[in-house]
Amino acid sequence: MPCEEVVEMLAVAGLDFVLVDCEHGPADVLALRHHLALADAHGMAVLVRPGEGEHVLAQRALDQGAQGVVAPHVESAADAEALVRALRYPPRGARGFATYSRAGRFGTVTADGHRAAADDRTLVIAMLESPAAIRDAGAILAVDGVDGYLVGVADLGASRSPDDPSVADLLAAVRADPTTAGAVRCDLALGDTAAALADGAQVVVHNLTHVMMQAFRALRA
């Protein structure tokens, strides 16, 4: 939602991070830049979800200070490798290097310091949004430079055929898969954050529209 005050309110409320959706949400590059600047001023981390294959937007978000990227529709190890090439500095990737950005503290850090900080703090999350991606989760998460996964349940449900397992079964399968055990698990929670964490999630995301609509409905007499 392209409203800078919302980002500021989330920071003041004490949330750990905000995920800015540039795939389905209406935020453009200018709004994203404002979100990142406000979050940085409050010391709150920002993750950005670009559109499918929008690696340049993701790179610009990282240059502007985003701490991570949640990349949609990562279907295979090859997709994951392309993602890492775009988002990681050499030698792990091929991202263009600049230190005069917000992420480089406007040229006040050394090149080596900026590279080390980017490598240490940049979180790369692959969204698994089809039965094929769920089946290949182990190979996707084995790619060096991919830190974790978020199952996109809406697209997963829309893309499955009648012969595929249910969304609940696919979710259970990827969470039980031993090849995903070392990856950061991100969950889109529709309810209690504590319940998602207790179930094994390390990062929990809430949909702002859902949160606001629930609050608005609760106001009705």
List PLM regions with ranges.
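Alpha-helix-loop-beta-strand connector modules within alpha/beta enzyme cores
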Residues: 29-63, 85-92, 97, 116-119, ...
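Conserved beta-strand positions in the central sheet of alpha/beta enzyme cores
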Residues: 18-19, 70, 150, 204-205
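Short, well-ordered coil/turn segments that N-cap beta-strands
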Residues: 15-16, 42-46, 66-67, 119-124, ...
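C-terminal alpha-helical cap/extension of soluble enzyme domains
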Residues: 54, 98-105, 122, 128-134, ...
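Conserved N-terminal beta1-alpha1 strand-loop-helix module at the mouth
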Residues: 1-46, 51-53, 124, 143-146
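Conserved anion-binding
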Residues: 56, 66-144, 148, 153-158
